[in-house]
Amino acid sequence: MQLIKCLVIIQLSLLLVEESFAGRDFYKILNVKKNANTNEVKKAYRRLAKELHPDKNKDDPDASTKFQDLGAAYEVLSNPDKRKTYDRCGEECLKKEGMMDHGGDPFSSFFGDFGFHFGGDGQQQDAPRGADIVMDLYVSLEELYSGNFVEIVRNKPVTKPASGTRKCNCRQEMVTRNLGPGRFQMIQQTVCDECPNVKLVNEERTLEIEVEQGMVDGQETRFVAEGEPHIDGEPGDLIVRVQQMPHPRFLRKNDDLYTNVTISLQDALVGFSMEIKHLDGHLVPVTREKVTWPGARIRKKGEGMPNFENNNLTGNLYITFDVEFPKKDLTEEDKEALKKILDQSSINRIYNGL
């Protein structure tokens, strides 16, 4: 009897836990693990937003619902406070505590107000268009190696209704003027329509710029309609151009990395073991058991940069060695001992090495 009572209590407890976690599984919606960091959450949302956008899935009657679920999942899992509450007791707790406000628009933060095109006709070619804005984004080599999200806040001019009307859609038309009996003149004049008046107002906008693994210096990301506005047409685009900052230890050439290591003369002669700290913190072991001459270069396969088109492919790391000679003078006894060890005659070869 006591055993049955315990089982009933356990069953009721499980039901209460299940009830407290009622609601959507945001981790499943975003397809991320429960220990996923913020950048992994952002990356998952950005990828899935392209796949699940209703404009790309017009034949799916549930497309809008799926897209809304995706946005809700991102809003919760990208916010530390909301995520902590969600992990504790699910979506119902968020609703009870008023934390599901649905006020955000993550899609526009990642892709701009006008999103992106899915291969359609896009904007009309003849429509007037505002100027593009080019913005340089300075990033570290570490960010280009591992990937990152950079949040930028900018004042974007947007059109708002204003009182009165204005001339719009102005164009040149041919008009016939009567100059008298049997005399006419064709002239060209500007003809405009009357449109509701508008004004430009600066609004603060936040954009999430993804620095993707393997991006190269000068590579551009385009945000449609985030550029200069045009009162009679469409806004231009915002073009974010990656500018790679110099790195103190590594030089990048395409997908390969180059670095220099200075070793002692002793290590150059007898060999050595060391580790090089890579861009993401992992250690690259380097071992030499033979003589290393000044300017010697070795290759570490697969320790370069990830390829932008295919992150499964990586370049190589090339290590060039410099040898530091001792500063102190040797005694005559040391010199003689060294000559015996090296057993090498003088080589005074003169040549043009340039």
From Swiss-Prot:
Occurrences of domain J (ranges): 25-90
Glycosylation sites per record: 260, 312
Effect of a null allele: Males are sterile and display an age-dependent decrease in testes size resulting from a gradual loss in somatic hub cell structure and a decrease in the number of germline stem cells. Hub cells frequently do not localize to the apical tip and are instead present throughout the testes. The number of hub cells is not affected. Reduced DE-cadherin levels in the hub cells. Absence of integrin clustering and decreased focal adhesion kinase (FAK) phosphorylation at the hub/cyst stem cell interface.
GO MF terms held by the record: integrin binding; misfolded protein binding; unfolded protein binding
Gene3D superfamilies according to UniProt: DnaJ domain (1.10.287.110), Urease metallochaperone UreE, N-terminal domain (2.60.260.20)
Location in or out of the cell: Nucleus; Cell membrane; Secreted
Gene Ontology annotations of biological process type: cell adhesion; germ-line stem-cell niche homeostasis; male germ-line stem cell population maintenance; positive regulation of integrin-mediated signaling pathway; positive regulation of synapse maturation; protein folding; protein maturation
Pfam families (alphabetical): DnaJ, DnaJ_C
Keyword field: Cell adhesion, Cell membrane, Glycoprotein, Membrane, Nucleus, Secreted, Signal
Annotated Gene Ontology cellular component terms: endoplasmic reticulum; extracellular space; neuromuscular junction; nucleus; plasma membrane
Tissue and organ distribution: In the testes, detected at low levels in somatic hub cells, cyst stem cells and the apical tip (at protein level). Levels in the testes decrease with age (at protein level). Expressed at low levels in hub cells, cyst stem cells and germline stem cells, and at high levels in spermatocytes and cyst cells.
Signal peptide (from-to): 1-22
Superkingdom as given in the UniProt entry: Eukaryota
Further information: The name 'shriveled' derives from the shrinking testes phenotype of mutants.
The protein's role, per its UniProt record: Maintains stem cell niche architecture in the testes. Activates an extracellular integrin beta-PS pathway which regulates DE-cadherin (shg) levels in somatic hub cells, and is essential for maintaining the number of germline stem cells and the structure and localization of hub cells.
UniProt-recorded name of the protein: DnaJ homolog shv
Organism, as annotated: Drosophila melanogaster (Fruit fly)
Lineage of the species this protein comes from: Eukaryota, Metazoa, Ecdysozoa, Arthropoda, Hexapoda
